[in-house]
Amino acid sequence: MDISDFDFTLPEHLIAQHPPEVRGSSRLLVALSDMPLQDRVFGDLPDYVEAGDVLVFNNTKVMKARLFGQKDSGGRIEALIERVLDNHTALAHIRSSKSPKPGMGLVFEGGIRAVMVGREGELFCLRFEGGQTVYELLEQNGHLPLPPYIERAADADDDSRYQTVYAKYQGAVAAPTAGLHFTEELLRRLKDKGAVTAEVTLHVGAGTFQPVRVDKIEEHKMHSEWFEVPSETVAAVEAAKARGNKAWAVGTTSMRALESAARATGYLKDGQGDTDIFITPGYRFNVVDRLVTNFHLPKSTLLMLVGAFSGMGHIRAVYRHAIEREYRFFSYGDAMVLGRNEGGGL
């Protein structure tokens, strides 16, 4: 398949630069194939969830992963922590006029000292000094890493708004943005209706913003992210399916975790590890029946994923509708509900 199959023109003013004034007040485009497109608000989501359906949320928490400082040699440096390996070691993307060499000392804001001890591909391995853990150092001295299409610095409001209300486990560089729309009150309404909630963890990496640089998407190398699907979630999904109910993925990261856990056998299994699953049109879905997701970038792997799930013809019509009606796009933008189309293709 050619990358041009996943391109579209997006007016720049539709890229949301800030969250909505009130969490949960975003618009919701319901784009199920068995009904006309419906323009709703996100608080209407329970209207489309049946008692007994299971909604699976990604409980990852965004780290304040960006650090600014300088090398011992004096040059300025910026580090974006991609993955914490242990209490004092992390892998990071580095921006600097010259790449640091093994053994070079680095000093970041707050007096944080680190040594570059090696490389893993394009990532630099940093060993942090002192008694605090990497997570503690980041929480006290780091900066929230907003996506590259948000053209402003992070502020205090982002510390809460670029985080889901159910975030638990630090490790993400980017938020699972479909979850940003959910409030405690909406979660209560879903449970009152009889919906079941379950959780997975997938620590979203900076690779989620990585552009596809090849013409043939089959040649694209997908980034890897750590995930976990607990046995309780497997049981909740299996019970819902046995009742004839649907499994909802809240966000593409929840979908990638669930489908990764079922990739080997076709059946959902508990476990943890790294996944580089690349879902494109023609993929056979094993777990997810419904997807809540934001609107994605042109030519992105996430646009390919939703095209695989609902069919690219349907997705093109949905995106045309969204642009005509000026929905807000990307991380702080509006959301949509999609259903699985087994015949999904281009």
Swiss-Prot record:
One biological process term in Gene Ontology: queuosine biosynthetic process
Any Gene Ontology CC annotation: cytoplasm
Pathway: tRNA modification; tRNA-queuosine biosynthesis
EC assignment: 2.4.99.17
Disulfide bonds: none
Family classification: Belongs to the QueA family.
Protein name (record): S-adenosylmethionine:tRNA ribosyltransferase-isomerase
Native source organism of the sequence: Neisseria gonorrhoeae (strain ATCC 700825 / FA 1090)
